[in-house]
Amino acid sequence: MMEDLIGELIPHQGCAITRIDEGIKVAGSAMNWVLSAALAPLVVRAPLAFRVVGMTDSTNLRLYWHRGIVILNWECDVRELRVHDPLTAEQHGLPGKGFITTNEWHEVLWEIRLDSMRVVVDGELLFETKGNYAGIESAPSVGPCFGSAISVREFNITPLL
């Protein structure tokens, strides 16, 4: 597995990154529709595994890669998992799949292969789809939204074979 990038994340779009004992705290700009994020200082291509161990204080633990987004504790319905396709930005809503307990650590794994992707949270497969992700290059990031704050203990990008 690639080294933990937690100490190298760059604040983006008004994001504030604060060191805490167990990692970092990421707070947004407190402006609605501004997607503040802690951005990795590298561009990656599929196939990859994007892994975050993080928590939210309320809503919106979000992972970003290109046009794709994984949203846990979505502000409109905390129980609905939201997944936006990295190639097409098509939005998928999965009722009953998106809630994580607040102020507790959760492992979020977003595997993006050349022809498919899947989202696994705390060891449970929550979403899987087909797609052509071979030509995408982008920097992964993690962030809060709409007033939430998140904490991140681990941020890893691993090439998949």
What is the predicted role of each segment?
Residues 1-45, 116:
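Low-complexity, Ser/Thr/Pro/Gly-rich disordered linker/stalk regions
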Residues 14-19, 24, 70-76, 110, ...:
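Short, exposed beta-strand/loop patches in secreted or surface proteins that constitute
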Residues 24-85:
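Secretory/extracellular carbohydrate-interaction modules
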Residues 34-42, 94-100, 141-143:
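Beta-strand-rich interaction surfaces with strong enrichment in secreted/lumenal proteins
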Residues 50-52, 103-121:
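Short tryptophan-centered beta-strand motifs in secreted/extracellular beta-sheet-rich domains
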Residues 62-64, 118-120, 156:
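Beta-strand signatures of extracellular beta-sandwich domains
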Residues 86-109:
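Short, aromatic/His-centered strand-loop micro-motif at the edge of beta-sheets
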Residues 126-156:
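Flexible glycan-contacting loops in extracellular carbohydrate-active proteins
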